[in-house]
C-alpha cells in the first residue's frame, strides 16, 4: 500500500499530461488533407503554364473555383508515385506529400499556385492530382496527366502553319483572281489597239493619197509656167499636123 501511495502523484501527473496533449494527437492523426466523408471524381478546369529556363522550370497551376470551395489540395507524382517538384506558399504540407492551400471563397475566380520543377525531370511522365474541398466533408478530385495533350493543360505552344500550306493557300487564292482580272483587260486592250491602228493607218493613207493627187492637179493647172508650156506644146503639134 505504501508503494501505491508513493506512485499516485506520478500517475496523476501522467493522466494530466495525456489529457492535455490528446487534442494535438487527435489533430495530427486526423490530417485535413486526407479526411473527407465523400470524394467524387470530376473534370475540373485546370490550366498549366510554364516559364523560365536553366536548372528549374516554374509552372503556374490555375484551378477554377467558386464560392463553395474553401481548400485546394495539390499533389504531383511521377510513374513511381514519388513527389515531383516544390510547391510555393502552401498553407500546410500533408502526410502524403501533397500540399494544402486555403482559399478565400469567391464567385467564379481562379486559384493560382506556383510549382517549381527541376529541368531534368521528365514532365510528360508526371500526374497532377487536384482536390477541392467544398464543405460538409465533401471533396471533388481530378487527375491530369501532363504527358497527354489536353485542352485544359496547354504545356506546348501551338504549332505554326507550315510553308507548304502557306504556298498552297497563296496559289489557290491569287491565281484565279489574277487570271480573271488580266485576261479580259488584255484582250480588250489588244483588240482596241489593233482596231485603232488599222483605222488610223487606213484613214491616213486614203487622206494622204487624195490630198497628194488633188495637190498635183491644182499645181499642174494653176501654175503659169505649166500653162505656157501647154500652149507651146499645142502650137507645135498643130504645126506638125498641118
UniProtKB/Swiss-Prot annotation:
What is the protein's species of origin? Answer: Mesocricetus auratus
Q: Which residues are glycosylated?
A: 47, 56, 66
Reproduce the UniProt comment on modification after translation.
Answer: N-glycosylated.
Function, in words: Modulates leading keratinocyte migration and cellular adhesion to matrix proteins during a wound-healing response and promotes wound repair. May play a role during trichilemmal differentiation of the hair follicle.
Signal peptide (residue range): 1-26
Instruction: Output this protein's name.
Output: Placenta-expressed transcript 1 protein
- The superkingdom of the source organism is Eukaryota
Instruction: Give GO BP annotations, semicolon-separated.
Output: cell differentiation; negative regulation of cell-matrix adhesion; positive regulation of cell migration; wound healing, spreading of epidermal cells
Induction entry: Following tissue damages of the skin.
**Record InterPro entries:** PLET1
Residues carrying lipid (GPI-anchor amidated serine): 223
Main location, first listed in the record: membrane
Which residues are annotated as pro-peptide in the record? 224-242
Provide this UniProt record's keywords sorted from A to Z. Answer: Cell membrane, Differentiation, Glycoprotein, GPI-anchor, Lipoprotein, Membrane, Signal
Enumerate the PANTHER family for this protein: PLACENTA-EXPRESSED TRANSCRIPT 1 PROTEIN (PTHR22527:SF2)
Where in or outside the cell is it found? Apical cell membrane
GO CC entries: apical plasma membrane; external side of plasma membrane
Topology of this chain in the membrane = Lipid-anchor; GPI-anchor
The free-text tissue note of the record is:
Present at high level in the dermal sheath cells near the bulge area of the hair follicle and in the differentiated sebocytes of the normal adult skin (at protein level).
Amino acid at each position: 500500500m505504501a508503494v501505491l501511495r508513493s506512485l499516485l502523484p506520478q500517475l496523476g501527473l501522467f493522466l494530466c499530461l495525456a489529457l492535455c496533449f490528446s487534442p494535438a494527437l487527435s489533430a495530427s492523426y486526423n490530417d485535413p488533407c486526407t479526411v473527407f466523408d465523400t470524394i467524387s471524381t470530376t473534370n475540373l478546369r485546370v490550366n498549366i503554364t510554364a516559364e523560365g529556363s536553366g536548372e528549374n522550370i516554374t509552372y503556374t497551376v490555375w484551378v477554377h473555383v467558386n464560392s463553395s470551395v474553401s481548400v485546394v489540395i495539390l499533389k504531383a507524382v511521377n510513374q513511381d508515385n514519388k513527389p515531383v517538384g516544390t510547391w510555393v506558399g502552401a498553407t500546410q504540407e500533408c502526410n502524403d506529400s501533397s500540399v494544402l492551400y486555403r482559399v478565400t471563397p469567391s464567385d467564379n475566380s481562379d486559384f493560382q499556385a506556383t510549382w517549381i520543377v527541376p529541368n531534368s525531370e521528365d514532365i510528360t511522365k508526371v500526374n497532377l492530382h487536384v482536390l477541392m474541398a467544398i464543405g460538409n466533408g465533401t471533396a471533388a478530385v481530378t487527375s491530369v496527366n501532363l504527358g497527354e495533350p489536353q485542352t485544359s493543360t496547354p504545356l506546348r505552344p501551338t504549332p505554326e502553319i507550315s510553308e507548304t500550306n502557306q504556298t498552297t493557300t497563296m496559289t489557290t487564292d491569287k491565281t484565279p483572281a489574277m487570271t480573271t482580272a488580266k485576261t479580259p483587260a488584255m484582250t480588250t486592250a489588244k483588240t482596241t489597239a489593233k482596231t485603232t491602228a488599222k483605222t488610223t493607218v487606213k484613214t491616213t493613207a486614203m487622206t494622204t493619197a487624195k490630198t497628194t493627187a488633188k495637190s498635183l492637179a491644182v499645181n499642174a493647172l494653176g501654175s503659169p509656167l505649166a500653162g505656157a508650156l501647154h500652149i507651146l506644146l499645142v502650137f507645135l503639134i498643130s504645126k506638125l499636123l498641118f
